[in-house]
Amino acid sequence: MKTWQKIVVGGAGLMLASSILVACGSKDSKSSSSDPKTIKLWVPTGAKKSYQSIVHKFEKDSNYKVKMIESEDPKAQEKIKKDPSTAADVFSLPHDQLGQLVDSGVIQEIPQKYSKEINKNETQQAATGAMYKGKTYAFPFGIESQVLYYNKSKLSADDVTSYETITSKATFGAKFKQVNAYATAPLFYSVGDTLFGKNGEDAKGTNWGNDAGVSVLKWIASQKGNAGFVNLDDNNVMSKFGDGSVASFESGPWDYEAAQKAVGKNNLGVAVYPTININGQEVQQKAFLGVKLYAVNQAPSKGNTKRIAASYKLASYLTSAESQENQFKTKGRNIIPSNKTVQNSDTVKNHELAQAVIQMGSSSDYTVVMPKLNQMSTFWTESAAILSDTYNGKIKESDYLAKLKQFDKDLAAAK
């Protein structure tokens, strides 16, 4: 990693700079290389065209130019940390990278003006996704959660409210032989267990090693003998859904169009997760909630408060109600908005997928904001191994508790 000088500008200075940003814009148009008038922006892959109008509006209002580049969100942290001083001023990222970027000093708490707007305009879960250790570090512009897809010719809307009804009347498919922890691990939330504590930020706060956790493993193991359960793999989800072998499965918005093609637009139903019976208790199945963010990297500005203030202003434009509505309507984007006003618009209310995701993301009854800690890398591999081995019969039932207690210890010791 190249050495760079860390310059952090406080909120008061930024607000002063922001207030004179437009007025001073024309005077600074002949600025030197130490006071550049161009902001580098990284947007998600395939999103550049959809942001052109809002970026043009920002340029007109601020007298700053924006150099917009498409970049892969999952690699945001890696690319920014490589050399923050030459990276983007404003960049998109998934919220689970937030903690590592804050801990490494790459991004700072956003000015209070914007954090107040976020808390007022965005859903509570989305605002939580933009926070770390009680402070707001980024701007939400969308939410993402898995939902239940089902074939309406095989199951009714009432049927899919209960996992037991689904599997008694038809079939449910999931990847249990090779578990996807993102999809399956939230079952532990359903029985009251926590991952990295109640707020997801306590590295030693995982408590799967208890009777509730054991009941989850017993349930997973029991699905091998459930006639209504079909094990899937990465390559056959849509083919099984299309040929009728599977009447329902859980996935995210990214599979919506493929699911429509598999069973036909008129046959595809979308719903929130069902309730599920674990150890004789009817509980709500839960999912991870992902939040899409824009963050500001102050390093390229080299202490130029006007440019930093302009960068925060650009992030605010990109995540505004107007921009979120456009991101939802644009074909190929279809980002589910986190802004409460946009969520209540007729366009969003009349969209079945959007309504299911919004209900999933409406409260902790359905979703838990995915933790942002470094230790998540250990979590993914170790939890997937335990869950897969349980389904495949590689762990004795008598060893479930010990395995889970060791898992808790391993996560607590991870860095």
Regions found by a protein language model. Give the residues of each.
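Glycine-centered hinge/linker elements that transmit conformational signals in sensory
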Residues: 202-233
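Short helix-initiation/N-cap motifs at beta->coil->alpha
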Residues: 70-79, 96, 230-243, 254
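Extracytoplasmic/periplasmic solute-binding protein
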Residues: 137-141, 146, 164-214, 246
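Extracytoplasmic/periplasmic substrate-recognition and gating elements
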Residues: 262-333
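Conserved N-terminal structural module of periplasmic/extracytoplasmic solute-binding proteins
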Residues: 3-13, 17-97, 277, 375, ...
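Ligand-binding "clamshell"
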Residues: 103-109, 133-135, 259-283, 351-352
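C-terminal capping/gating helix-and-loop segments adjacent to ligand/active sites or protein-protein/ligand interfaces
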Residues: 131, 337-340, 354-410
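Hinge/lid segment of periplasmic solute-binding proteins
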Residues: 95-147, 158, 270-271
